[in-house]
């Protein structure tokens, strides 16, 4: 997998966490960098671990699905991408009515981080069928998430109304394109 594809996956995996961070940043009275960095580290570590778990699960099943692995990668990335696009286009839920002061403790951040990293676990399953170093991929996903969450919280008030949902749509489109590229390259013997 090319370095550009790795970076794009890292970016795509961090967009849902970025969208969540914008909401958290907008809900905080005055987010300070230390709090934003703390949230970024929590989200980044979780987001880096989940694709490794998915990759291990995928590797365990590799011998059974090697003949159609490209279809699995395409299906997983495509489905996740479409789901992210759908969530980005969907109207906001009632979670905005909740007390914002209850969303910034360690366990709340960790739970939110895990919820936004389920897609990274599924991507990890797909990565098990590709020629990619999972350690590098996990590190890139974790660093992208750390950066995006920290920035999302700091710019939450400003970006909340402008970018929030669009970030998830962009991430979904990127996943669909990468999935289609994997399928195309396998079917046409490219790469």
UniProtKB/Swiss-Prot annotation:
Probably functions as a manganese efflux pump. It comes from Stenotrophomonas maltophilia (strain K279a). It is a multi-pass membrane protein. It holds the Pfam family Mntp. The keyword Heme does not apply. It comes from the Bacteria. Belongs to the MntP (TC 9.B.29) family. This is Putative manganese efflux pump MntP. Keywords: Cell inner membrane, Cell membrane, Ion transport, Manganese, Membrane, Transmembrane, Transmembrane helix, Transport. InterPro entries: Mntp/YtaF, Put_MntP.
């Amino acid at each position: 997998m090319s370095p550009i594809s790795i970076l794009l996956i890292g970016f795509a995996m961090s967009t849902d966490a970025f969208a969540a961070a914008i909401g958290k940043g907008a809900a905080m009275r005055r987010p300070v960098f230390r709090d934003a960095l703390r949230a970024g580290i929590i989200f980044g570590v979780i987001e880096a671990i989940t694709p490794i778990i998915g990759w291990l699960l995928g590797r365990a099943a590799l011998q059974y699905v090697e003949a159609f692995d490209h279809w699995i990668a395409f299906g997983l990335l495509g489905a996740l991408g479409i789901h992210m696009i759908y969530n980005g286009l969907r109207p906001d839920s009632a979670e905005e009515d909740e007390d914002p002061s209850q969303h910034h403790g360690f366990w709340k951040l960790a739970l939110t981080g895990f919820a936004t990293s389920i897609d990274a676990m599924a991507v990890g399953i797909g990565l098990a069928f590709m020629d990619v170093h999972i350690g590098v991929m996990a590190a890139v996903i974790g660093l992208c998430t750390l950066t995006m969450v920290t920035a999302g919280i700091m710019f939450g008030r400003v970006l909340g109304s402008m970018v929030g949902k669009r970030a998830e749509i962009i991430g979904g489109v990127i996943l669909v394109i990468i999935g289609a590229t994997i399928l195309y390259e396998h079917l046409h013997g490219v790469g």
